[in-house]
From Swiss-Prot:
Record-stated family: Belongs to the isocitrate and isopropylmalate dehydrogenases family. LeuB type 1 subfamily.
Record note on cofactor: Binds 1 Mg(2+) or Mn(2+) ion per subunit.
Subcellular location: Cytoplasm
Purpose: Catalyzes the oxidation of 3-carboxy-2-hydroxy-4-methylpentanoate (3-isopropylmalate) to 3-carboxy-4-methyl-2-oxopentanoate. The product decarboxylates to 4-methyl-2 oxopentanoate.
Name under which the protein is recorded: 3-isopropylmalate dehydrogenase
One GO cellular component term noted in the UniProt record for this chain: cytosol
Length: 355
C-alpha cells in the first residue's frame, strides 16, 4: 500500500514525522513517499501544488497531509498561496466528503473551555461537503457594481451554489455514517434566508426516505452554532455545506480542549482519502518541538480505517493514544494539573511505546 506523505509548512513536518514513526511501528509494511506541498511546494517549483506532488497523490492509496500556510506568503497572488494546495488536492482527487470527529477524552475534560458536565462523553461527527458552495461557486471576483444603491462603486461578490448530485451524494454519506452510530442525523442550513439552503433541505428530506431507520432533523446554522456551545452532547452526526461546515467544525473542535487532538478525513466516492489534523500550520511555534502530534497520529488511524482497510491497526493506534493520555503525558496545549508536559517527539515516542 502506497501512502503519499505531504508534510507541508510550519509545524507540518514535525507532526507528520511522529505519525510516520507510529505507522512504522505497526506490524505492516507501507510504501511511504514524501513530496513538498504548500509553501514548501512553492519554494520547490513555483506552485503550492507541484505537478509531481499531484501525480504522487493520484497514484497513492491514501494521502497523509500535515498543514500548509505561512505569513511570508501572504503577499502572493491568491492562486500561489500555500492554502491553494489543499483546495487543489480536493478538486483534482474529487474529495467531496469531510469527516471531522470532535471527541472529548475523559482525561482532557478539564481542558475544555466549557464545564465538564457539558462535554464529558462528547462524541460528535461533522460531515462537511467539500466541493461546492460559495467557496467554489462562479462567478466571483471584484468589479464595478452595475446597478443597485452603490452602482458605479467597487464591489466584491461570490456565488453560493449547489447541484442536486452534490447534495445527494453527501446526504448518502452522512446517512450511512449516522446509521453506524446513534441513527440520528442533523442537517444544518439557512433555509429561512437562502434559496441554496432550502434546496439543500428539500434534497435531504427526499434522501431520508431511503433511510427509515435514521432520524433526520434540521437546524439553522446560527442556532446550531449557539447550541454547540450551550448543549453540545445533543448532537451525534451533523451534515452541512462547505462554508457552514468549515465554521462549525472549528467551533466543535474547541469544545474538546484543543484542536491539536482532532483528526480529519476527506474522502472520494471510493473511500480514497486525504488525512490531516484539523489545526493549521502554526508558524509561530514551528521548529520549537512543542506542537501536539496526536491529531496527526489519529488522522493516520482514520487513514488505516477508511482507505486502507486496516481497522484493527487503527484501533491499536487509538487505544495507544488513550493510554498515553491516561499515563499523564501532555503537550502544552492540553496541559492539565499533575500531567507530565512533553514535546512533539516525546509524545510520538510515548504513543509508539504504548503500541
Amino acid at each position: 500500500m502506497k501512502i503519499a506523505v505531504l508534510p507541508g509548512d510550519g509545524i507540518g513536518p514535525e507532526i507528520v514525522n511522529e505519525a510516520v514513526k507510529v505507522l512504522n511501528a505497526l506490524d505492516e509494511k507501507f510504501e511511504l513517499e514524501q513530496a513538498p506541498v504548500g509553501g514548501a511546494g512553492y519554494e520547490a517549483s513555483g506552485h503550492p501544488l507541484p505537478d509531481a506532488t499531484l501525480k504522487l497523490a493520484k497514484e497513492a492509496d491514501a494521502i497523509l497531509f500535515g498543514a500548509v500556510g505561512d505569513w511570508k506568503y501572504d503577499s502572493l497572488e491568491r492562486a500561489l498561496r500555500p492554502e491553494q494546495a489543499i483546495l487543489g488536492l480536493r478538486k483534482h482527487l474529487e474529495l467531496f466528503a469531510n469527516f471531522r470527529p470532535a471527541i472529548c477524552y475523559p482525561q482532557l475534560v478539564d481542558a475544555s473551555p466549557l464545564k465538564p458536565e457539558l462535554v464529558a462523553g462528547l462524541d460528535i461527527l461533522i460531515v462537511r461537503e467539500l466541493n461546492g458552495d460559495i467557496y467554489f461557486g462562479q462567478p466571483r471576483g471584484v468589479r464595478t457594481a452595475p446597478d443597485g444603491l452603490f452602482a458605479g462603486e467597487r464591489e466584491g461578490f461570490d456565488t453560493m451554489r449547489y447541484s442536486e448530485p452534490e447534495v445527494r451524494r453527501i446526504a448518502h454519506v452522512a446517512f450511512q455514517a449516522a446509521r453506524k452510530r446513534a441513527k440520528k442525523l442533523l442537517s444544518v442550513d439557512k433555509a429561512n434566508v437562502l434559496e441554496t439552503s432550502q434546496f439543500w433541505r428539500d434534497i435531504m428530506i427526499d434522501v431520508s426516505k431511503e433511510y427509515a431507520d435514521v432520524e433526520l432533523s434540521h437546524m439553522y446554522v446560527d442556532n446550531a452554532a449557539m447550541q454547540l456551545a450551550k448543549a453540545p452532547k445533543q448532537f451525534d452526526v451533523i451534515v452541512t455545506g462547505n462554508m457552514f461546515g468549515d465554521i462549525l467544525s472549528d467551533e466543535a473542535s474547541m469544545l474538546t480542549g484543543s484542536i491539536g487532538m482532532l483528526p480529519s478525513a476527506s474522502l472520494d466516492k471510493n473511500n480514497k482519502g486525504l488525512y490531516e489534523p484539523s489545526h493549521g500550520s502554526a508558524p509561530d511555534i514551528a521548529g520549537k518541538g512543542i506542537a501536539n502530534p496526536l491529531a496527526t497520529i489519529l488522522s493516520a488511524a482514520m487513514m488505516l480505517r477508511y482507505s486502507l482497510n486496516r481497522a484493527e491497526q487503527a484501533d491499536r493506534i487509538e487505544r495507544a493514544v488513550k493510554t498515553v493520555l491516561e499515563q499523564g503525558y501532555r503537550t502544552g496545549d492540553i496541559a492539565t494539573p499533575g500531567g507530565q508536559q512533553v514535546g512533539t517527539t516525546a509524545m510520538g515516542d510515548a504513543v509508539v511505546a504504548a503500541l
